[in-house]
């Protein structure tokens, strides 16, 4: 009887490089989980795809008295930055005026992406920026971007991004840290 040949092992897929100024590593997970530093983490493209495709983004801010506030918004992931708008009198805008630190996560608890950063109000007189955001809104939500004196649009560059999938947790849990100087 002829010997069966073992299937050839394919070379591991080459991971796309992470963005400049970004380092992948392990998130802070208790030692009981048994995680050890490894050579390969989730590629940042995994997080970027989820951020770009997500319909809703949960924005988490803190009230001036420190109490948390979470609310879903629509937004756009464009060129490594998350944009979202709101009414200037909204709770989230008032919170961000007091403390611009923000944590943002997507809907899924099975394919997790969490972004931490600082919300920066964009200049509404920058017509090229508004045109880009309006085009993104029309493509994604089939409606124009709402811009006016009662509104504010924020940009959030990531400082930290966390991601994992439920089926491979904790083995694929990944944290990307961004150099703030490169933002």
Feature-to-residue mapping (PLM):
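Charged, gly/pro-rich active-site loop segments
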Residues: 2-42, 111-183
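Short, conserved active-site entrance elements at the starts or edges of catalytic domains
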Residues: 31-64
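Short, solvent-exposed cationic patches
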Residues: 32-39, 89-109, 144
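A generic local structural motif
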Residues: 43-46, 69-71, 89, 141
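Active-site phosphate/pyrophosphate- and oxyanion-stabilizing loops and adjacent acidic/basic residues
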Residues: 45, 94, 135
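Short beta-strand segments
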Residues: 54-88, 94-96, 102-106, 114-118
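Generic structural signal for secondary-structure transition and capping sites
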Residues: 55-56, 101, 142, 161
């Amino acid at each position: 009887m002829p010997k069966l040949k073992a299937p050839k092992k394919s070379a591991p897929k080459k991971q796309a490089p992470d963005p400049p100024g970004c380092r992948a590593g392990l998130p802070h997970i208790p030692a009981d989980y048994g995680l050890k530093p490894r050579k390969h983490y989730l590629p940042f493209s995994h997080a970027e795809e989820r951020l770009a495709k997500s319909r809703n983004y949960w924005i988490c801010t803190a009230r001036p008295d420190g109490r948390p506030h979470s609310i879903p918004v629509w937004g756009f992931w464009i060129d490594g930055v998350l944009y979202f708008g709101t009414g200037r009198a909204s709770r989230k805008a008032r919170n961000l005026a007091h403390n611009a630190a923000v944590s943002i996560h997507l809907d899924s608890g099975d394919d997790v992406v969490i972004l931490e950063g600082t919300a920066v109000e964009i200049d509404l007189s920058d017509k090229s920026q508004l045109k880009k955001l309006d085009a993104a809104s029309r493509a994604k939500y089939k409606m124009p971007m709402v811009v006016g004196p009662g509104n504010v649009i924020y940009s959030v560059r990531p400082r930290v991004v966390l991601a994992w999938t439920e089926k491979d947790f904790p083995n694929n849990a990944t944290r990307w840290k961004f150099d703030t100087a490169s933002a």
